[in-house]
Amino acid sequence: ATYKVNAYQAARIVSSRSRLSIPDKVQSIRLQYNPLGNGGRYFIARFLYVEKRDISEHTYIELQGLGFHPLQINAFTRLRRLSIGVNIISGPTGSGKSTTLKNMLELLYEEKKKKVNIISIEDPPEYEIEGTAQLPVTNVETEEERGAEYRKAIIAALRSDPDIIMPGEARDAEVISLVFTAAMTGHQVWTSLHANSALAIFDRLKDQGVDDFKLTDPDLLTGLIAQRLVKKLCPDCSLSLSEYEAINGMIGDIDRKLIEGHEATVRFPNLNGCPECFHGYTGRTIVAEVIEPDYKFLDLVSQGKRQEATKYWLTQLNGMTMTEHAWIKMVEGSICVHDATVKVSHIDKISSERKAFLIETINRTV
């Protein structure tokens, strides 16, 4: 009813409320319509699928299935056990942030024996989240109205006696202020924003005017997470290096350098595919980094000592960068070197010492 030929428009189709014929496994479809200068149309449809899961399964299996490393899964477990604090998941659009948030809330609901009040504020709700009261943003026509209604919904949630609150996106300074207010008044908070790394979350918060005393308190700023999605190789038909080169020719010198010493374990896509995959791939997997900051880490970051803070995180807080996580998956053969380098940078900068540590983490979990 509101379709306009030459306007930029977004829409959402929900299977339970639509008269259209939508496949059973599709929960909703997010649409973006853009007019082109030549009179054409540029249309994007993002399908959100129903997630089949047994929440009685062990937490480790749930998050491992998404692609998180055991070190990161343990970190998430510790974060969920905290009674208060802000936990922020960052990444670009389409990096799986909503799926991770959904899993966190459902795991919290299960771990708290379903005796917990969890409220989310989403614009719009992308998935049904078991055990969560999901507040949508409604009755808006302009972006200004949308922002005001979103903030109003967060305030309403805070007045509804929540234990855990999840604003889907910390989209502006006012929302971020409400997020920290929620934590300071005794709530565990999960949210997301757009940042290129876990450390860059700190910069985004500072740019939005968050006070220094909040940014240097690890009891308040408890979790900094960044993630990407990388195409996952089909385990049934992926190719060894020699098989791939026999079909496609020699890989480049840069890629050969990146896999040096692990030629026997790396894998490549079979672009012809098999009955179990789509052109050599079976979905996507997460590469991530999770920081549980302490006073020293936040103090170093606040002083602008980024290299020292990163070194401290990696060596003293048992950290792992997103690039290192991608390297592990590449060495294990679950993602291809080509796909890894598209999603993360500086794989060639991982030191021999760090590689030895990462190999040790693989051996501990085999």
Can you say where each PLM-predicted feature lies in the sequence?
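Conserved, well-folded catalytic cores of nucleic-acid-processing
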Residues: A1-T2, Q32-L36, V50, L66-H69, ...
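Helical mechanochemical/support elements of P-loop NTPase systems and associated helical scaffolds
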Residues: V5, Q9, K25-Q27, G37-R41, ...
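Conserved nucleotide-binding/hydrolysis micro-motifs of P-loop NTPases
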Residues: R19, N34-N38, V50-K52, V86, ...
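NTP-binding/hydrolysis catalytic cores, primarily Walker-type P-loop NTPases
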Residues: Q64-R78, I251-V366
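Hydrophobic alpha-helical scaffolding
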Residues: L66, S90-G94, E169, T191, ...
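Switch/coupling sub-region of P-loop NTPases
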Residues: T77-R80, N87, M104-K231
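Cys/His-rich Zn2+-binding cysteine-cluster or related metal-binding knuckle/ribbon modules and their
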Residues: N196-P293
